[in-house]
Swiss-Prot record:
Catalyzes the transfer of a methyl group from 5-methyltetrahydrofolate to homocysteine resulting in methionine formation. Binds 1 zinc ion per subunit. This is 5-methyltetrahydropteroyltriglutamate--homocysteine methyltransferase. Its cofactor is Zn(2+). Belongs to the vitamin-B12 independent methionine synthase family. The lineage of its organism: Bacteria, Pseudomonadati, Pseudomonadota, Gammaproteobacteria, Enterobacterales. Keywords: Amino-acid biosynthesis, Metal-binding, Methionine biosynthesis, Methyltransferase, Repeat, Transferase, Zinc. Zn(2+) binds at H641, C643, E665, C726. Pathway: Amino-acid biosynthesis; L-methionine biosynthesis via de novo pathway; L-methionine from L-homocysteine (MetE route): step 1/1. 5-methyltetrahydropteroyltri-L-glutamate binds at R17, E18, L19, K20, K117, R515, C516, W561, E605. The keyword DNA-binding does not apply. L-homocysteine binds at I431, G432, S433, E484, D599. GO terms for biological process: methionine biosynthetic process; methylation. The gene is metE. It comes from Shigella sonnei (strain Ss046). Its EC number is 2.1.1.14.
Length: 753
């Protein structure tokens, strides 16, 4: 039994973010649709070839997406919301972009679909919308076209398809409520048609992704798998693919399915390989997800070999990445600024392909010498002084319960804050960042490259901050921000100023659509060598009599949006970051900054996938935030911001943060999220986002007023703030000015009654 290897998917954006640049050029009207499509074809061909050259046997096809793969599946099934449909009923790439962005070079603008996190990763998808009586048909043949491309290039192809049950699970009902699972029989004929088309092309195996099978699903959803896969069997071999957790709790459901193979995540899952081998049908192939698709760390291949060797020769076996390599940067070899020791600890997507080749070869031959050689830097790292800082470990061990308690309760603090700030009803503010113009990005880049000295750089940043204050005062906002011109990314900026982090030059990963992030990597104990934000916050406050918010990214978000080290717990990392940022809060306060925002957009998305694991995570996540904030005095107002969240299942923890004001993303969900706060009787102040910053569309005064009135039916008006959904860094100034002017006008109208 020869062992093969494969990946579940590969990064799409290109080493130099070619896809992002092509998308944004097309959206701006600077290039044609055909030019965009050509970039996509070139990237796919390059990425298949790179994987093949790195030693991958079966290449994933269908993992490429123009926005996200769930949205691609929606178009495949003909699931296009009426507001985004072309007048002639056709579907094209602009249809896809209108769903994702609210607008495209052709067609009428309309509200973008809701966006949320893909399981517990930092990747996003557009939430499918379902209505009662909906019809589905094969509408978008991107998968088939890409399979044809790969076959024409001579590749050994394994198509990738999001499974029908997971697809329905990920969506939301719009309008009249009904059970979306009832649509299963309506979408299965489209899946049958796609599988038939793949069979015609001579495809042997199809990777059908059902990551919902790692969740604690309701019984009705588990029961849906058998009839669904009964309907899909027979045309090609199906590799039922799961990831992000183990499958043991749902193994009885899985083993009853008429599929020919199962992929399991043996990195994040707790599954025992011997137990899996025993319980899986003997004729099934097992795809062992041994190489972590979500991290940047070199694998200990001797350990991976030991994990799987006992079943070699006993069943058909493939070795694979745990999940798609989408979540990892592309290529470590282009990183020229990492020192040799640190670089030796890492593996990006292409290096992970090489790891799979080494592992396959060792399992087939029994010769493990190459595995030991590859794994040597992992052993050396365990004793590196770059990793351990005794002072940090000592401070962490000394934390007491008092360190996470504000001096007084919210009611006492609110009185002190009202006396200090004297804000009007319906106070207006923004979430933090303002448009990152070409001028700002060029300024930072020139400084980073050494083409601009520190004095000229600081003068330039100061001018952009001054302009941001002038703009806000002109608009009539009540609580201002400095605009974050000096920050490239809300996590990367802090990581650059904290010990224990390193950065890459080209370690980009896709977040959503054309948005890419370059996460910091936590390599050791975290500490703050010097103040980070104080100087610019103090300067901004000197320009105005209105309060200017200090802006920090919270400890859980820095953790969740970085690549964490794996030799200590996530709790340990979060609390180390919290202690570092606690010192920053104290320094901001001492500099006269009276409102400090600690953003925690990632608190909910960091939840474990299984509800039974939530309590432990929420306990330390809340404690980390409170350690960060609790040093503040009563009349210092602590804000926090959260986005893409559903709160109803963690309201106790949201309240336990004890932030004076929470701002949340609500406009895409039409204020639905406020139901949670109303039912919980949330005691502190809330700023429900009144317009969607992910879309360039400008909301009308009337629309914002209507949303605020809707909010006031759920939350007392005296505890409501008025703000956008999120930061404005990705927007342009024209729509930002127009949207904020309308937002301020709506607040003023409500003050007048």
């Amino acid at each position: 039994m020869t062992i093969l290897n494969h990946t579940l998917g590969f990064p799409r954006v290109g080493l130099r973010r070619e896809l992002k640049k092509a998308q944004e050029s097309y959206w701006a009207g600077n290039s044609t649709r055909e030019e965009l499509l050509t970039v996509g074809r070139e990237l796919r061909a390059r990425h298949w070839d790179q994987q093949k050259q790195a030693g991958i046997d079966l290449l994933p096809v269908g993992d490429f997406a123009w926005y996200d793969h769930v949205l691609t599946t929606s178009l495949l099934l003909g699931n296009v919301p009426p507001r985004h449909q072309n007048k002639d009923g056709s579907v094209d790439i602009d249809t896809l972009f209108r769903i994702g962005r609210g607008r495209a070079p052709t067609g009428e603008p309309a509200a973008a679909a809701e966006m949320t996190k893909w399981f517990n990763t930092n990747y996003h998808y557009m939430v499918p919308e379902f209505v009662k009586g909906q019809q589905f048909k094969l509408t978008w043949t991107q998968l088939l076209e890409e399979v044809d491309e790969a076959l024409a290039l001579g590749h050994n192809v394994k198509p990738v398809l999001l499974g029908p049950v997971t697809y329905l699970w990920l969506g939301k009902v719009k309008g009249e409520q009904f059970d979306r699972l009832s649509l299963l029989n309506d979408i299965l004929p489209v899946y049958q048609q796609v599988l038939a088309e793949l069979a015609k092309r001579g495809i042997e195996w199809v990777q059908i992704d059902e990551p919902a099978l790692v969740l604690e699903l309701p019984q009705a959803w588990l029961d849906a798998y058998k009839p669904a896969y009964d309907a899909l069997q027979g045309q090609v071999k199906l590799l039922l693919t799961t990831y992000f957790e183990g499958v043991t709790p749902n193994l009885d459901t899985i083993t009853a399915l008429p599929v020919q193979g199962l992929h399991v995540d043996l990195v994040h899952g707790k599954d025992d390989v011997a137990e899996l081998h025993k319980r899986l049908p003997s004729d099934w192939l097992l795809s062992a997800g041994l190489i972590n698709g979500r991290n940047v760390w070199r694998a200990d291949l001797t350990e991976k070999y030991a994990q799987i060797k006992d079943i070699v020769g006993k069943r058909d076996l493939w070795v694979a990445s745990s999940c798609s390599l989408l979540h990892s940067p592309i290529d470590l070899s282009v990183e020229t600024r990492l020192d040799a020791e640190v670089k030796s600890w890492f593996a990006f997507a292409l290096q992970k392909c090489h790891e799979l080749a080494l592992l396959r070869d060792a399992l087939n031959s029994g010769d493990t010498a190459a595995l030991a050689e590859w794994s040597a830097p992992i052993q050396a790292r365990r004793h590196s002084t770059r990793v351990h800082n005794p002072a940090v470990e000592k401070r962490l061990a000394a934390i007491t319960a008092q360190d996470s308690q504000r001096a007084n309760v919210y009611e006492v603090r609110a009185e002190a804050q009202r006396a200090r700030f004297k804000l009007p009803a319906w106070p207006t503010t923004t979430i933090g960042s303002f448009p990152q113009t070409t001028e700002i990005r060029t300024l930072r880049l020139d400084f980073k490259k050494g083409n601009l000295d520190a004095n000229n750089y600081r003068t330039g940043i100061a001018e952009h901050i001054r302009q941001a204050i002038v703009e806000q005062e002109r608009l009539g906002l009540d609580v201002l921000v400095h605009g974050e011109a000096e920050r490239n990314d809300m996590v990367e900026y802090f990581g650059e100023h904290l010990d224990g982090f390193v950065f890459t030059q080209n370690g980009w990963v896709q977040s959503y659509g054309s948005r890419c992030v370059k996460p910091p990597i936590v390599i050791g104990d975290v500490s703050r060598p010097a103040p980070i934000t104080v100087e610019w916050a103090k300067y901004a406050q000197s320009l105005t009599d209105k309060p200017v918010k200090g802006m920090l990214t919270g400890p859980v978000t820095i953790l969740c949006w970085s690549f964490p080290r794996e030799d200590v717990s996530r709790e340990t990392i979060a609390k180390q970051i919290a202690l570092a940022l606690r010192d920053e809060v104290a320094d901001l306060e001492a500099a006269g900054i009276g409102i400090i925002q600690i953003d925690e957009p990632a608190l909910r998305e960091g939840l474990p996938l299984r509800r039974s694991d939530w309590d432990a995570y929420l306990q330390w996540g809340v404690e980390a935030f409170r350690i960060n904030a609790a040093v503040a005095k009563d009349d210092t107002q602590i804000h926090t911001h959260m986005c893409y969240c559903e709160f109803n299942d963690i309201m106790d923890s949201i309240a336990a943060l004890d932030a004076d004001v929470i701002t949340i993303e609500t406009s895409r969900s039409d204020m639905e999220l406020l139901e949670s706060f109303e039912e919980f009787d949330y005691p502190n102040e809330i700023g429900p986002g009144v317009y969607d910053i992910h879309s360039p569309n400008v909301p009308s005064v009337e629309w914002i007023e209507a949303l605020l009135k809707k909010a006031a039916k759920r939350i007392p008006a005296e505890r409501l703030w008025v703000n956008p959904d999120c930061g404005l860094k990705t927007r342009g100034w024209p729509e930002t000015r127009a949207a904020l002017a309308n937002m301020v006008q709506a607040a003023q109208n409500l003050r007048r009654g």
